[in-house]
């Protein structure tokens, strides 16, 4: 797969700063672009998001939009998928290899999800995560991680390391950990 393939995580009016911070960290780890559509349910403060994202805020490629119309006007002719409990297919039912370079996946706000009219307009590419009947949704940050990694798995993880890079691929087998305090 092309190393230029890119996942674009689109957050529709997120309400919880800690979820956005966790998503920032996921986007940095996966080389994904983060798009945040306002209004937000919290004050967007770099300092707080950086602390909650384990210091990765300065590393994330992100864009803020005033509203849905602003996002649409700046992102024409994109390949947009939506995730919602109302989706008829699962995230793994889609073949993301059919996409040329970029995929945009929109995740809704924690309380009410994606605007229903937006869902209706994109319903042929709206999917859900399978889950038991006892719950209606999975935490937003967890959902982003699940979906992003499914797309990247199908693309064979372009540009991502498949071995440990900070301590070395043979760190465990060479027992280097025994010398640490």
Regions found by a protein language model. Give the residues of each.
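Post-transcriptional modification and biogenesis factors for structured RNAs
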Residues: 1-181
């Amino acid at each position: 797969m092309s190393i230029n393939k890119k996942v674009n995580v689109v957050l529709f009016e997120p309400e919880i700063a800690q979820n956005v911070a966790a998503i920032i960290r996921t986007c940095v780890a996966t080389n994904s672009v983060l798009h945040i559509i306002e209004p937000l349910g919290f004050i967007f403060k770099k300092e707080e998001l950086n602390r909650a994202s384990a210091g990765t805020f300065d590393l994330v490629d992100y864009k803020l939009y005033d509203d849905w119309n602003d996002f649409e006007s700046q992102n024409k002719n994109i390949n947009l998928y939506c995730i919602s409990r109302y989706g008829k297919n699962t995230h793994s039912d889609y073949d993301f290899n059919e996409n040329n370079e970029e995929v945009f996946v929109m995740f809704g706000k924690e309380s009410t999800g994606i605007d229903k009219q937006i869902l209706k307009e994109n319903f042929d590419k709206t999917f859900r995560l399978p889950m038991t009947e006892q719950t209606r949704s999975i935490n937003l940050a967890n959902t982003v991680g699940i979906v992003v990694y499914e797309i990247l798995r199908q693309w064979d993880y372009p540009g991502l390391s498949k071995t440990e890079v900070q301590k070395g691929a043979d760190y465990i087998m060479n027992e280097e950990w025994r010398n640490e305090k």
